[in-house]
């Protein structure tokens, strides 16, 4: 990331913001996962149930139909959604094969599929739904929709130029924010998503899914961001700093211990997969 973006974020985070008044409208929560996410998911769920200030109608887990995932959903009062039912095809059917050069290749079909699920508006019954990464843990109360129905976006200092290059392909006239919407969580409005799908399809003449797939740079490991695309597309919104802390798996503890230790200075914690070890989460 650039030094300029770091400075902009710090200035933004140091500002004093008025308290947000949350909407009373219920929301759904939609979490796409694969089996390896089950170790960290209990902490994510506890954070959602403790810190999302809106009424939650249902929590949906979108995943492969594997016995351990279905059993986890039954044990934790979650609604399981077979990932192949969302679009009528499986992640592997995207065939997103990458060429990194020097004989190195990769398959990002599953990674992109989860992003398309978040953008689909096809899961849940509420107009608004919160998507959150399985390794992200909320430790302070979060408002995602204000009482005048503006979406709240929690801004970060992430900076990855291929995301912005991709957006310029999809929607060339879209003005981009000087901070990042990549925040591990986002509230989606199905009405806004309809407009986004239409705008993407109008630009290309193809379906929004095919347009995104065709726009992906096959030489780039991470060439698309659903959060950057949607956040920049929504016009009526409220922005706040994310105040997040990234931690290695060796720092895992039960939820209350994490909350007591970090909530004085941070609003959320993330335990990235690349910092993962074979550790059982305490719940």
Predicted region positions:
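Active-site-proximal specificity loops/subdomain of glycosyltransferases
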Residues: 69-120
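Conserved donor-nucleotide/metal-binding helix-loop-beta segment in metal-dependent transferases, i.e.
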Residues: 138-171
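The conserved acidic donor/metal-binding loop of glycosyltransferases
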Residues: 133-137
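Short, acidic, metal-binding catalytic loop of nucleotide-sugar glycosyltransferases
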Residues: 46-56
């Amino acid at each position: 990331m650039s030094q300029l973006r770091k400075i902009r974020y710090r200035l933004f985070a140091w500002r004093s913001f008025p308290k947000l008044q949350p909407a009373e409208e219920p929301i759904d929560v939609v979490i796409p996962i694969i089996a390896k996410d089950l170790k960290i998911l209990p902490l994510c769920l506890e954070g959602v149930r403790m810190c999302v200030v809106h009424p939650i109608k249902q929590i949906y887990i979108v995943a492969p139909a594997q016995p351990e995932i279905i059993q986890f959903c039954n044990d934790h009062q979650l609604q399981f959604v077979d990932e192949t039912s969302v679009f009528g095809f499986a992640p592997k059917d995207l065939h997103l094969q990458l060429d990194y050069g020097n004989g190195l290749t990769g398959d990002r079909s599953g990674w992109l599929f989860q992003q398309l699920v978040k953008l689909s508006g096809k899961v849940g019954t509420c107009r608004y739904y919160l998507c959150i990464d399985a390794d992200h843990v909320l430790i302070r109360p979060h408002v995602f929709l204000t009482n005048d129905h503006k979406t709240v976006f929690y801004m970060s200092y992430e900076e990855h130029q291929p995301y912005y290059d991709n957006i310029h392909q999809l929607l060339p006239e879209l003005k981009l924010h000087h901070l990042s919407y990549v925040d591990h969580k986002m509230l989606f409005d199905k009405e806004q998503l309809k407009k986004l799908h239409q705008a993407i399809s109008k630009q290309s003449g193809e379906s929004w899914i095919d347009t995104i797939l065709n726009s992906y740079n096959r030489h780039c490991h991470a060439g698309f961001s659903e959060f950057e695309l949607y956040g920049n597309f929504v016009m009526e919104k409220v922005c706040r700093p994310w105040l997040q802390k990234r931690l290695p798996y060796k720092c895992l503890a039960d939820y209350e211990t994490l909350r007591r230790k970090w909530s004085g200075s941070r609003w959320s914690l993330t335990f990235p997969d690349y910092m993962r070890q074979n550790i059982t989460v305490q719940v």
